């Protein structure tokens, strides 16, 4: 007998809506159990998905999806949504090569109304959908589901500010699993939310507004009385000021609270705001006890749980950065560490513990993080911003206008440069070398191994100007970082192998495969180290002695390091052919990093084939 008899009968939200309401609790239980079993086999995001089981069921039960639009902020909490919308069997390939994505994708399902993965975009997107429906006279609802972390970002508040004046049928659901608002969650607030979302209350409210609106002092008094009364129970005043009708907070794991409240809200017009309280890891004691550990997981035994401890493997680049930052901070009190809500992922846990007064988590606010760092640099401190490549994209103006233009000594420690694997197109660091190389005053470095990463970080903090050190996700080549730390000469690369006819110019993580290609072709191999400034003397030397220069980078080939090499070679009197290899002009899907590199021709076989196509071995 199947352990999921109710779940297996649900192939779409229509099947869910045909389910007896009294059976929904069992559906939730089976969905949660299936999530634990499935994610333990594939890896993925677990805690956040366990925390949204009941909310997901209630939304698809009450609203007429996909005609009513649900936009999930960030999107890593949508596994339950995928299961209920016909993708239960596809979960076995979640985040794997050729399988379904770990985030919503419009091309994957009509129920994925908007692609997400970066935070704080849901309200803007849902508002656009709601306004389009309003202007076309369509009676549908747009719902944005956003977490309390994502709600802290400026873009979310920009959208709230705009939405309050739009009079569109938008529902914003705040999925609150961090704030300490436990006292208001109970029978009183459940009743209050149900009453406040009901037709009787809202009809009376509209009548009262019309009557009292004819007497301005009375209207203001009524508003203040209502605001005061609600303020004693719920933290909704802020959202009311934006022009929303606020309901909650209610228990996000209580279907008997969620469903009637959503049913009432669905009947209302204009912008509505529902505040639900959930718990990450709900229903799986190990994840409840440590939701951070179970936030993003690899395959594990769900009965025994994730086994922590030293793996004894190679250092990851994130660990190299973490060790360096603690070492340099111990020697220099001017060092401060900044992260936009990525303490664990960016390697700042130990720094935060050892130097709490010099550690700043600014929340999901990449723009603020960079300008905050610029302000610190103005006052003589040495800020180090630890940030993923994909999230640095969100702060490009601040990098140019607030840091580089003023030539401020801010260090950008850019993690996850290149292809990151299972998170896919939304998280690959595919564009950073392209958008960094054109910024004046900025020094851009890409280490080839762990030791070089440590030395480059030290070089960055010694440099009196803005710097970026861009390193890949995962482990290095096993090189042990050397002591003492030494500042590298700015803009100087090195020859790692001398050969004939062909020279391979490797940037960062591509050095290892470049050396393999060099051995196969008896080619010269250069470790370029710096994307900006380029080692023009080294390039000129290679150009004078080789018929073909091959640039290899784990970055978009358009506008990347290879483009800069080709631009310089074009100024030389002796101009060999330049073959630029990198990521193609398309978004790269998810899968194992090695699979992805092979798929875009950046493994040994692919590089050799590309060279053979333009410069046959017998030439």
From Swiss-Prot:
Thiamine diphosphate binds at residues 76, 117-119, 149-150, 177, 284, 366. Binds 1 Mg(2+) ion per subunit. Binds 1 thiamine pyrophosphate per subunit. Pathway: Metabolic intermediate biosynthesis; 1-deoxy-D-xylulose 5-phosphate biosynthesis; 1-deoxy-D-xylulose 5-phosphate from D-glyceraldehyde 3-phosphate and pyruvate: step 1/1. It catalyses: D-glyceraldehyde 3-phosphate + pyruvate + H(+) = 1-deoxy-D-xylulose 5-phosphate + CO2. It comes from the Bacteria. Its EC number is 2.2.1.7. It is an enzyme of class 2 (transferase). It holds the Pfam family DXP_synthase_N. InterPro entries: Dxylulose-5-P_synthase, THDP-binding, Transketo_C/PFOR_II, Transketolase-like_Pyr-bd, Transketolase_BS, Transketolase_C, Transketolase_CS. One of its GO terms (biological process) is terpenoid biosynthetic process. Homodimer. Belongs to the transketolase family. DXPS subfamily. Catalyzes the acyloin condensation reaction between C atoms 2 and 3 of pyruvate and glyceraldehyde 3-phosphate to yield 1-deoxy-D-xylulose-5-phosphate (DXP). This is 1-deoxy-D-xylulose-5-phosphate synthase. It comes from Azoarcus sp. (strain BH72).
């Amino acid at each position: 007998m199947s352990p999921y008899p109710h779940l297996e009968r649900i192939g779409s939200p229509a099947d869910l809506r045909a389910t007896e309401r009294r059976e929904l609790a069992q559906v939730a239980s089976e969905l949660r159990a299936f999530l634990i079993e499935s994610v333990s086999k594939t890896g993925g995001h677990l805690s956040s998905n366990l925390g949204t089981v009941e909310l997901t069921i209630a939304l698809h039960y009450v609203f007429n999806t996909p005609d009513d639009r649900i936009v999930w902020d960030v999107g890593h909490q949508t596994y339950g949504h995928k299961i209920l919308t016909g993708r239960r069997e596809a979960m076995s390939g979640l985040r794997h090569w050729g399988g379904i994505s770990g985030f919503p994708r419009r091309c994957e399902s009509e129920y994925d109304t908007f692609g997400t993965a970066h935070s704080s975009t849901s309200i803007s997107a849902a508002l656009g959908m709601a306004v389009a429906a309003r202007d076309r006279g369509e009676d549908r609802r747009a719902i944005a589901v956003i977490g309390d972390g994502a709600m802290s970002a400026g873009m979310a508040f920009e959208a709230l500010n705009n939405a309050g004046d739009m009079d569109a049928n938008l529902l914003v659901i705040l999925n609150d699993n961090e704030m300490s608002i436990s006292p208001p969650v109970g029978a009183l607030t459940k009743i209050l939310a149900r009453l406040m979302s009901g037709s009787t209350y809202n009809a009376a409210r509209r009548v009262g507004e019309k009557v009292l609106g004819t007497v301005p002092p009375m209207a203001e008094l009524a508003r203040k009385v209502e605001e005061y009364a609600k303020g004693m129970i719920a933290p909704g005043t802020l959202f009311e000021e934006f022009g929303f009708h606020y309901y909650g907070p209610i228990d996000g794991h209580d279907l008997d609270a969620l469903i009637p409240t959503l049913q009432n809200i669905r009947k209302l017009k204009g912008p509505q705001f529902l505040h639900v309280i959930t718990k990450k890891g709900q229903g799986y004691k190990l994840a409840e006890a440590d939701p951070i550990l179970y936030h993003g997981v690899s395959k594990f035994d769900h009965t025994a749980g994730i086994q922590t401890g030293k793996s004894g493997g190679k250092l990851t680049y994130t660990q190299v950065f973490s060790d360096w930052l603690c070492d340099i901070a111990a020697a220099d009190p001017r060092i401060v560490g900044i992260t936009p809500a990525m303490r664990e992922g960016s390697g700042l846990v130990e720094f935060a513990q050892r130097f709490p007064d010099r550690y700043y988590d600014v929340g999901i606010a990449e723009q603020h993080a960079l300008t905050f760092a610029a302000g610190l640099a103005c006052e003589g401190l040495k800020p180090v911003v630890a940030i993923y490549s994909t999230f640095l994209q969100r702060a490009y103006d601040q990098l140019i206008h607030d840091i580089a233009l003023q030539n401020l000594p801010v260090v950008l420690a850019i993690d996850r440069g290149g292809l990151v694997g299972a998170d896919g197109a939304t998280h690959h660091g595919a564009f950073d070398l392209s958008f960094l190389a054109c910024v004046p005053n900025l020094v851009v470095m890409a280490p080839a191994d762990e030791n070089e990463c440590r030395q480059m970080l030290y070089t960055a903090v010694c440099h009196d100007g803005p710097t970026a050190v861009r390193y890949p996700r995962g482990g290095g080549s096993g090189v042990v970082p050397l002591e003492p730390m030494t500042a590298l000469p700015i803009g100087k690369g090195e020859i790692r192998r001398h050969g004939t006819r062909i020279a391979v110019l490797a940037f960062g993580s591509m050095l290892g495969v470049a050396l393999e290609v060099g051995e196969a072709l008896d080619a010269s191999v250069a470790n370029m180290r710096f994307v900006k400034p380029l080692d023009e003397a080294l390039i000129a030397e290679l150009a004078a002695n080789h018929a073909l220069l091959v640039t290899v980078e784990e970055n978009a080939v358009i506008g990347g390091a290879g483009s800069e090499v080709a631009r310089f070679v074009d100024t030389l009197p002796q101009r060999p052919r330049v073959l630029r290899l990198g990521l193609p002009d398309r978004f790269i899907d998810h899968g194992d990093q090695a699979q992805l590199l092979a798929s875009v021709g950046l493994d040994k076989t692919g590089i050799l084939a590309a060279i053979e196509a333009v410069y046959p071995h017998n030439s």
